[in-house]
Amino acid sequence: MAARNVLLLVADDLGKQLGCYGNPYTKTPNIDKLASEGVRFDNAFASTASCSGSRSTIYTGLHTHQNGQYGLNSGKHHFMTFDHIESGPALLAKNGVRTGIIGKVHVGPDAVYPWEWRAESLTRDVWWSAQRAKEFFEASQKDGRPFVLTVGYHDPHRDRTRGGFGNDEPVDDRIQSVKYRPEDTVVPEFLSDTPGARQELAEYAEAISRLDQGIGFILKELEVAGFAKDTLVIFMSDNGPPFMNSKTTLYDAGVRLPLIIRQPGSKSSVNTNLVSYVDILPTILDWALGQASQEAKKQLSGRSFLQVLHEVKDLADWDHVFGSHTFHESTNYWPTRFIRTRRYKYHRNIAWRLDFPFANDIYGSLTWEDIRNAEESPKKIGQRKLKDYFFRPPEELYDLDNDPQEVTNLVKSPDHQEILEELRGRLEDWQRRTNDPWLYRDGISILLNKHHLDAGLEVPDKWDLDIEHPETNRGDVPKYKNLPFGIAGARD
């Protein structure tokens, strides 16, 4: 049987600003062509909208509170994946698969992510990336070993200048500079329409078009090497666009992202089922290892969607996803969790008394400067009041059919108490199953106090206590049942 290879292409800070996702402004012919040849997912979700954390979920099949990559990778602060985690590169190597990574890595330590072949770089030169892939393919041609190659692009991430996206950096002459006019840009609903936002979106679109050319270059090299006929191609992004209301938030603009998969010999289709980034590694293992993947997948939170890849109907078993964010930068502590169904989204903001923190690149942006200095009152980011962006309540509940921008919080709505209680319970059950240290009762981590549960002691729910009137007996609130931790089984 021919080797079953994988080419995993990961963009940096890319939302759905692509032609194949209905954006009429940004020119992305190569990505659009890939979508026309494969499956375009409309409901693919990152677990966290932060670079290192999101990439770690892709490469481990575990949420960040499970794998330890709580925030941006940093040896100085030891913000790294737990040493005991077996990542995709390690699991694949056990089965003789050649693994490689080109470009942005941004996870660690190296011992946990033992890619056999590395060409690490933050270059914007997508031709360079394609040539490194060519070298990798040539090595695979010589010995015939199956491979899983990951390419981490740096586009369309911001650069270190105000409003810049790396468009002035030197690149190969084969890369065309695709310019956009700010006055022509399409401002997404999650952003405010300001001159600074338009200027940055035009620069952002140029970086996306450069990324698109890189996708074309590398797919050509795959074809020339003769591997296109037996390689599963996966195109995705780590998190949403680097703007407020998106990156570092768990609102849909930050976590509902492009995912395109081309399976050899299959027709194009659109899949509307809800899949999570923790499902990517199980799917890769399924494709690359076949039956041998069963043992490796047992330790993962995700599940393979290979069998439902071409499903055009909404399936009951694929109707929700969970998400987990704790840090972005090491000083950006704001732990929050979510569950999203087809219609509703529930956020549990664990450290809700803290102001929502800024990522450095977003704080220095022209978009934020325009919003901060705007004369309108109240100030807004898109449809959201600025104060509601900074100061968030313990819980948020949104009806996405009627409120896709997640602005009108229904937590106190009498008509939505049943769905609130259901989603609250499902989220907490998931936190228990995944051993989440940030599941709290009265300010105490349940996981860290598991010995109390094991001893038969009751751990009260903070929702049983009226913090403004602690003398009140909340006997009308049923006690939450003590579930065991780490239950293996279905996502729900």
Positions of PLM-derived features:
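Beta-rich accessory regions
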Residues: 424, 429-432
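Short, charged, surface-exposed hinge/linker loops at domain edges
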Residues: 439-453
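A contiguous binding-surface segment within folded domains or other stable secondary-structure elements
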Residues: 399
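Formylglycine-dependent sulfatase
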Residues: 1-396, 404-425, 438-439, 454-492
